[in-house]
Amino acid sequence: MKKTRTYLLRGILATAVLLLIAFGIALSNARVELTEHGAHQRLLVPIGIGMAGLNTFAGTGDQVHIPGFLDGPVVRRKADGSWAATWFCENKVQQLTGSGTDLAIDCAGKRHVFPVARTPMVADAVFDTPADTLILSDIEGNAHFLDAALASLAVTDAQGNWNYGDRHLVIAGDAVDRGRDVFAVLWRLYTLSLQARDAGGAVHLLLGNHEQYLLRGNTSRANRDHLYALTRMGGQLDVFGPDTLIGHWLCLQPVIIKSGRTVITHGGVNPVVADAGFTVNNLNSAMRRYWSGDMPTKAELDAVIGPAGLTQYRGYLEDGEERFARATEDQIDEVLAHFGAKSIVVGHTLVERVTALHEGRVWAIDVNSNTARPEALLIRNGEPAAVPTGVARQLDEKGGRRLTRPFSLFVASDLAMLKDLVMSNYALSRIPQPY
């Protein structure tokens, strides 16, 4: 028996050694994939006749320089009204402290001004229908599209300021991730929220699954250039922490609103959520309690952040297999009856144009693709209709120009990159699922 055990242990050890040797040989022929600006994307390891791509989410890079790119600012305000700001400009982090109402940043020859003295009040989640409510979804860090679409639709003026009077703008989730300009999008909406309030209007930023990923430290969908900048500024969890202006503001945003007789949420309302009796205010309260560390009940968590909850549900358009069944006409009627609504607006699931489904009881508005018709949803005097934005999304669906270079086991920076790759994937695996 002892000999058998000894042979078995030797066999296991020999196999492990052979695997390590094979992995070392593979690494000696590996390549590092980078963005065109030098941020690390993947480690390409030869496997057989192909290459296996190991994603890195560590925010590392080789002499990264991103022309004209401003990321941030991350602003923390003190009790005495002063503030401290950190931002990334092209290839380095800069900092400033001050006490004024605005923060002015000069980056790559362009001036950017941010309001830092006030936090926008969160608009009521249940409100009477304004004359006009314009709804967009799934901006996903595409600041160029957002700015151009809002100008085209006369929501903003030529200087990018609020021009929509007492009307309402709704972003139905997923303003962040994928695109590089996440901070630019959030600061634009933050600023417009202040200006809209002053004019008697409102901006509603609903949380989608990607805002939830961001606030929980899930970097798996982050643009790598943006992730590099985030890492230089302290990492995603720190940069969007509740002690920052943008992080605190995001944690206050709703997951569902009701405008007159129209419910708006990112993914949709699972019939199970309606059956549980949750109101709009119940659901938003549960989400805010979660961010503050006051853990909601399991039923509340399933409703607001679960795999079949408000931000992940796709049941009005497709079958979610184990997670949820496709909603029946009767179930949609029951959801609407529960909220006293006649229609529900959802993003999250791609469509080729802003589409009325289920005889107009559901409006699907996620047109975030290059092939979809450039449209938004306008609810005028309670009646929804698709309107052209006049602006294409212009998505870089291939992820930009990618570069590769050899990986070396004998270069300290490459070994550090490998360690950081492993640790970043380990950190992602440690994020509790589903919540």
Predicted regions, residues:
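Feature recognizes metal-dependent phosphohydrolase scaffolds
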Residues: K2-Y435
